[in-house]
Amino acid sequence: MVLKDDNSEKSIELFISIGLDEKTARNTINNNKVTANLTAVIHEAAVTDGCDRNTGNLLYSVATKFPTNALVHRPTLLKYIVNSKIKTPAQLEAAFAFFASTGPEDFKLNEFEEACGVGIEVSPEDIEKAVKGIFEENKKTILEQRYRTNVGELFGHVRKSLPWADPKIVKKLIDEKMYELLGEKTAADNEKPTKKKEKKEKPAKVEEKKAVVETTAEPSEEELNPYTIFPQPEQNFMVHTEVFFSDGSILRCSNTKEVLDKHLKVTGGKVYTRFPPEPNGYLHIGHAKAMFVDFGLAKERGGCCYLRYDDTNPEAEKEEYINHIEEIVKWMGWEPFKITYTSDYFQELYDLAVELIRRGHAYVDHQTADEIKEYREKKMNSPWRDRPIEESLKLFDEMRRGIIEEGKATLRMKQDMQSDNFNMYDLIAYRIKFAPHPKAGDKWCIYPSYDYAHCTVDSLENITHSLCTLEFETRRASYYWLLHSLSLYMPYVWEYSRLNVTNTVMSKRKLNYIVTNKYVDGWDDPRLLTLSGLRRRGVTSTAINAFVRGIGITRSDGSMIHVSRLEHHIREELNKTAPRTMVVLNPLKVVITNLESDKLIELDAKRWPDAQNDDPSAFYKVPFSRVVYIDQSDFRMKDSKDYYGLAPGKSVLLRYAFPIKCTNVVFADDNETVREIHAEYDPEKKSKPKGVLHWVAESSPGEEPIKVEVRLFEKLFNSENPAELNDAWLTDINPNSKMVISGAYAVSTLKDAAVGDRFQFERLGYYAVDKDSEPGKLVFNRTVTLRDSYGKGGK
């Protein structure tokens, strides 16, 4: 429910007066709780006539983050903010931590001021000294990596020693020191484009590709290190969330000091995260973002990340998927601290379910699935909701022993059927399934639900940060309700936007459908954005991780990232790592008439564009003989001013070889199809043609070059968002998404290429050797073309 219009406009005016922009102000009034809190904060701070934007932003944070167990102290904090004694987000976060720990108890002002850095002025000289010290410590690395140095790490070192330093001054001095040490950027430094500041994407809109624009805006701390948004484990005593019940009561979930101390003793204060995939399908690029968040946070903080298989559905899990997930996680560069399964905890989960019943928070229900759905829609309690605890305990034991038929009973959590949050409608904790479990065997015939097991195992594994995508945000109330009901340790929960990319589908159901029904060639089809498909296509894990890091860990949901952005990162990586070679896709024979038929000239071709002449490994040998092949697209009968290919009477340069001039054209019987070209070469290289062509020659007279198969891939779906087509999404599949060229010619050095090897086919794109290759028959997948459209406008 939104406030009435007259009150809404007054609230908007009030919020704008403290520096909020109109859009933020209007979004705020859609949340009654935040509106009420912010209005109260503004009045408590006595700034109803307005204030500067920095103060207003701090007040907004107080309204949304102040620990509810210390509301009595909020006026004190507001006084410090208005008087500019607390003026940075870092100081404010320290204040929140202080008050969350203090609660409603009295405190000493000097201890509060010390905890928040009040009165501490960090001079530019102090910052300059700290920056100088960090550069001295890391000088060798900086000189090696030059402008590819991770500036975020340098920034973090300075902030660690000077937590109250102005981040803008820190960044400015780091930039100046980099320039002082390295000088102007070289061409090599500039290979990687300057990071652009992106416009905030509108919900459900495809990310717009803007022209490259230089910006002088200072990057935020989150841009330098995306993990700074997450609190430290010792701060996990603050109120995690508030659960509003239909009777007006509020559950404010937080860890007690005793519970948190016990947790910290077990973990040693380290960060513990988990990556919890279901083993019922192959991982896709969205999972790459989840891995970056889960494993990345643990790595950045020197902590641990579990790989935990959420194997609560015995009918869906397969060993194939388990093996695939473990392999892909390692390929992506992540090392699990420990591999666990939810099924490892089946006994503990059962015991806790019994305890939940004993505490009056769960009951055995006999409603059918349709009845449960109907009662939820009507917000009605189940007829069995208030049955005696002993009766539910007995029935739950019978469920466990297999006495009750499948579908005749479930264990449901006694939450709040009248709540505004449908994820509090007495969610199912256990259901009966007479199916053996891939790991637990036939020991169990009841299995826990995701809503029951997920949060409970998080607690049992002492997870500090439970991170998931935004569609799970409404489940947060149920997550904390259950842990609170069982008096268990509560992890810090945070949701981020899921990764959506254009021209594909990432729904597990849809992926499974097109794989099962052979619209594609398996889970690792190179047209899919499954991680195995991307790997088979030739994409590196480094490129995928760079793509994910570039997107950031945001909460702006509903946006779709254009696939060209991913391709940009792929090109950046392969440009540095893929050696150059030459392949002709559609060969056209060229006879060099002024070269003897038995003559073979061995030439040097560059593997790398910046190859040094004194480095033999940077070159490979190519033969130049009387018969060479160019691509059919590089010849036409009629020349034009803007055409740089070969034409009758025209010269071109064969890359790494000689200029050639077309002297004659031989047609097929239809007098239209060009069968071969006759040309003369310029051994002295006196002519300087503008056009440069790639080519492949016979390695010896009469012996054709190596023949290879090349597969060209385009976008799998024609529409940027096929999901918008609802049930008609299959009609959007691009029938031309895969083209196979079976008669391409390659230089002889490629004959020893192995599966997974990546190359740049000059003038064509990046390609990788496919697993379908056999001795004597190489198959290449096109990874990506050479042209980069990301950030250049248009498609």
UniProtKB/Swiss-Prot annotation:
Lineage summary: Eukaryota, Viridiplantae, Streptophyta, Embryophyta, Tracheophyta
Binding site for ATP: 278-280, 284-290, 469, 498-499, 506-508
Organism: Arabidopsis thaliana
GO biological process, alphabetically ordered: glutaminyl-tRNA aminoacylation; post-embryonic development; reproductive structure development
GO MF terms, alphabetically ordered: ATP binding; glutamine-tRNA ligase activity
CDD domains according to UniProt: GlnRS_core
SUPFAM superfamilies noted in UniProt: Nucleotidylyl transferase, Ribosomal protein L25-like
Amino acid composition bias (Basic and acidic residues), ranges on this chain: 200-212
Protein name per the record: Glutamine--tRNA ligase, cytoplasmic
Listed EC numbers: 6.1.1.18
